A protein has these predicted regions:
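Enriched for short, Lys/Arg-rich terminal
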Residues: 1-5, 12, 53, 57-62, ...
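Arg/Lys-rich, positively charged N-terminal/basic patches that mediate binding to nucleic acids
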Residues: 1-30
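Alpha-helix capping and helix-coil boundary motifs
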Residues: 16, 37-38, 79
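A short, surface-exposed loop/turn module that caps and links secondary-structure elements
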Residues: 29-56
């Protein structure tokens, strides 16, 4: 069973963008399909680094999460440029 953690930053970003419903639906699909490559092809889950992944909620918005021992920790959400800036700051 996979569990999910949402950071304060993630929750705040999603809330301020008004994308709660969209993100909630995507999180359900990620929980169901993570680790099963055929199930998550529609979500566009991509590995960005060691244990770091992103998935799309739509064409323009993405969610960044860390996968570690059955826990998916979502830390950031945004468009392509925002994700790139976030990842540069993580290195």
């Amino acid at each position: 069973m996979i569990s999910v953690k949402l950071s304060k930053r993630f929750k705040k970003t999603v809330r301020s963008a008004g994308r709660e419903q969209e993100v909630s639906e995507t999180l359900k699909l990620v929980i169901e399909g993570f680790g099963n490559s055929h199930a998550h092809t529609g979500l566009s889950i991509r590995k960005l680094g060691r244990h770091v992944y992103e998935c799309r909620t739509g064409l323009a918005w993405r969610l960044v999460f860390v996968a570690d021992k059955g826990v998916l920790s979502f830390d950031f959400a945004g468009d392509h440029d925002e994700i790139q800036n976030y990842l540069r700051g993580k290195r």
